[in-house]
Curated annotation (Swiss-Prot):
Binds 2 [4Fe-4S] clusters per subunit. One cluster is coordinated with 3 cysteines and an exchangeable S-adenosyl-L-methionine. It comes from Streptomyces avermitilis (strain ATCC 31267 / DSM 46492 / JCM 5070 / NBRC 14893 / NCIMB 12804 / NRRL 8165 / MA-4680). NCBIfam families: lipA, PRK05481.1, PRK12928.1. InterPro entries: Aldolase_TIM, Elp3/MiaA/NifB-like_rSAM, LIAS_N, Lipoyl_synth, rSAM. This is Lipoyl synthase. The gene is lipA.
Length: 328
């Protein structure tokens, strides 16, 4: 086994250790069926003809057919180099290029061209920037909202899947002020193995960021990836901790190893357990839950947002539903 990564750099000791375990064979239930409806076909042709780029097609997301049929798509901002390394993530770690201040405008134009109902914006951690990339994330939301303000079907809704910005108050305030319809920050795994899987993040800090977003009035969301060494009991505890922190929406998925350099798959969670976890999360009190082997954090994102809003409005005092909807 070569100790050189595909990008030519020397592999980290952790990556060398990971590479000693061959890529695991997927169970038969890890498969998708291509269902190409008319809206998907339109989107596919548009993306190709306009030279647009979305995470959906570039990452080979298994849910692209359903999401594009609903006119939903995900965009990656901030470049292709992350300043942090998570042991499950396929994005490379390294020194990012200089901030592209025109990127938010271009993303907004892509959203307009694709006539999206719902856009998820995710990106890399930018600890190299003085503001941690807060302006970039916020400005992308502002551009999408501004450029789609006159859309016949209504302004495109934006979900911001963001890093933790080290929980810096000024950086969080910048991001929150852009008022994305949903603020998502993924904890991804349970406390016991968190530091090993996500050494650049802190579990309690992530919970704090979710709480801050909820206190600001934003709809909040997170994700748990299963199969990296957690126990069933730890998943239940993490769900309770997320809900207590103010998380309203949750997605639960199976870890799929990007390459031999990444953390080995420790278990394949069977479909019935995902069903059980969905029921458990709903009993805990989450407004919306998506749970399944091929669910991703942006899967059916627009539907989850709508579930959160319906619950907020039904829980609002009489005459207060309008206030609840304006809060996001």
């Amino acid at each position: 086994m070569s100790a050189v990564a595909p990008d030519g750099r020397k592999m980290l000791r952790l990556e060398v250790r990971n590479a000693q375990t061959p890529i695991e064979r997927k169970p038969e239930w890890i498969k998708t069926r291509a269902k190409m409806g008319p809206e998907y076909t339109k989107m596919q042709n548009l993306v190709k003809s306009e030279g647009l780029h979305t995470v959906c097609q570039e990452a080979g997301c298994p849910n692209i057919y359903e999401c594009w049929e609903d006119r939903e798509a995900t965009f990656l901002i901030g470049g292709d180099q992350c300043t942090r390394r998570c042991d499950f993530c396929q994005i490379d770690t390294g020194k990012p290029e200089a901030l592209d201040r025109d990127e938010p405008r271009r993303v907004g134009e892509s959203v307009v061209t694709m006539d999206l109902n719902y856009a998820t914006i995710t990106g890399v951690a930018r600890d190299d920037l003085e503001d941690g990339g807060a302006w970039l994330y916020a400005e992308t939301v502002r551009q999408i909202h501004a450029q789609t303000a006159g859309r016949e079907a209504g302004r495109t809704k934006v979900e911001l899947l963001a890093p933790d910005f080290n929980a810096e108050p000024d950086q969080l305030a910048e991001v929150f002020s852009a008022r994305p319809e949903v603020f998502a920050h993924n904890v991804e795994t349970v406390p016991r193995i968190f530091k090993r899987i996500r050494p650049g993040f802190r579990y309690e800090r992530s919970l704090k960021v979710i709480t801050e977003a909820r206190d600001y009035g934003l709809v909040t969301k997170s994700n748990l990836i299963l199969g990296m060494g957690e126990t069933r009991e730890e998943v239940s505890e993490a769900l309770r901790q997320l809900h207590d922190a103010g998380c309203e929406l949750i997605t639960i998925t199976q870890y799929l190893r990007p390459s031999v350099r990444h953390h080995p798959v420790e278990r394949w969670v069977k479909p019935h357990e995902f069903v059980e976890l969905k029921e458990e999360a709903e009993e805990i009190g989450f407004s919306g839950v998506m749970s399944g082997p091929l669910v991703r954090s942006s899967y059916r994102a627009g539907r989850l947002y709508q579930m959160a809003m319906e619950l907020r409005q039904s829980a609002a005092p009489q005459g207060g539903a309008q206030v609840a909807s304006q809060a996001v």
